[in-house]
Amino acid sequence: MKQIINTKFVKNILFSTLALFSAVSLVAQEEEEAPKFTLSGSIDAYYRANLNAGNGVDAQAPGSSFANLPGFALGMANVIAGYEGEKVGFVADLVFGPRGTDAIFASPMYSATGDIVNQLYAYWNVSDAVTLTFGNFNTFLGYEVISPVANFNYSTSYLFSYGPFSHTGLKADFAISDDFSLMLAVMNPTDLTEFNPVGQYAYGVQLGYSGQYANLLIDNGSYEIDFTGGFDLSDSFFLGLNAAYFNGDEEDGIGSFAGVAVYPQLATSENFTLGLRGEYFTETDFFGAIGASDAEGDASVFAVTLTGSATIGNLMIKPELRLDSTSEDTTFVNGNGEPIGSLSSFLLAAIYSF
C-alpha cells in the first residue's frame, strides 16, 4: 500500500526543529557574550623575627618593602571586583592593612579613602589585537608585584621596592603576533595615583617576546630600564630573572641604582615548592635604599631568601629564611647595640586566596 505523507505535518516538525536549534544557539550566544562580574582577592598575615638583632621596639628589618613588622603582624586584605564584557570592562582593586598602605604610600592626596585604592581602571578591547586601559594600574616593570599571592617569596626584593608600584594614566597594549607584544603608556609621575599636582608626565614602553619583557620608564628627568622573564627548565624546575638600572635626575639630587635577581624554584610535589631569591643591589649618590653608605653615597647589598611554599586548598603556608649582607658594617645593630653589616631573619606567612 502506498504510504501517504502529510506534508503539513512534516513542515511543522521541520519548523519546530529549526526554531528549537535557533533558540538554543541564541541562548548559547547570549551566555557566551553576557558580561561577567567577578570577585576575588586574598588575606595574609605573618610572624617575623630577627635572628642576630633585637626584636623589641627598635626592631630592624631589611630596606625592602613589606613584611617588615616584628612579631605576629598583618599583611593586608585584598578585594578585587571586576566586570568583563565582550569589549569593555573594569577592575576595582581595594586593599586594607599595612601591606596595602605601604604599597600606595603616596595616597591619599585628595580623597579621604585614597589609601585603599590599589587599582581602579576601565578597559576597552578595541580589537583582538588592541586593548586600551584608562585609570590606575599596577606597574609593568619588575618581576614581583604587590599581592603576595602572585609572588613566590613573601618578603620582597630591593629591585621591586625601589621601582614604581603603580601608575595612573592611559596605556595601549598591542598583540603584534602570537609571540610579540607591545605596550605604550602616558601617565602621571610615578606613584601619584589620585591626580597630577605637578603638570608633568611619565612615559612607558614594554616589548614582550614569549614571556620575556624589556621595559622602559621615563619620568621627569629620571629613567629606569628593566628586564623581567623566566624559563621552565623542566616540568618541576623554573628559573625567574629580573635586572634593572635606574638613573635618577641629578638636578633633583636623586641617586641611581642597579641590580639583578634570580629566582630558582623546584616543585618537590604537587603541594610543595622550594624557592630561592638571590639578589645583588647597588646604589650611588645617597639613593637611600640600603641604609648606610660610604662617604660618596655608594652602597651595595647581597640578599638571599630561601622560601618554602606549602599549598592546602586555597591556603598557602610560607616559611622563609633571609640574609641581607651589606657593604657597610654600620647598616644594622645587633642585640648588644653594636653595629653590624648583615641581618638574618625568619618569617612564617599564611596567605588565603579566593
State the predicted function of each range.
Residues 41, 45, 70, 74, ...:
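Residues on the lipid-exposed face of transmembrane beta-strands in outer-membrane beta-barrel proteins
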Residues 46-71, 100-119, 127-208, 214-216, ...:
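Surface-exposed coil loops of outer-membrane beta-barrel proteins
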Residues 78-99, 175, 181, 228, ...:
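Surface-exposed extracellular loop regions of Gram-negative outer-membrane beta-barrel proteins
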Residues 1-34:
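Cleavable N-terminal export/targeting peptides
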Residues 63-66, 100-103, 108-113, 212-216, ...:
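Outer-membrane beta-barrel pore domains
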Residues 38-42, 89-91, 131-133, 181-183, ...:
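Residue-level detector of the transmembrane beta-barrel scaffold of outer-membrane proteins
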Residues 30-45:
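Short N-terminal segments immediately surrounding and downstream of signal-peptide cleavage
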Residues 34, 84-88, 127-129, 177-179, ...:
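Outer-membrane beta-barrel channels and translocator barrels
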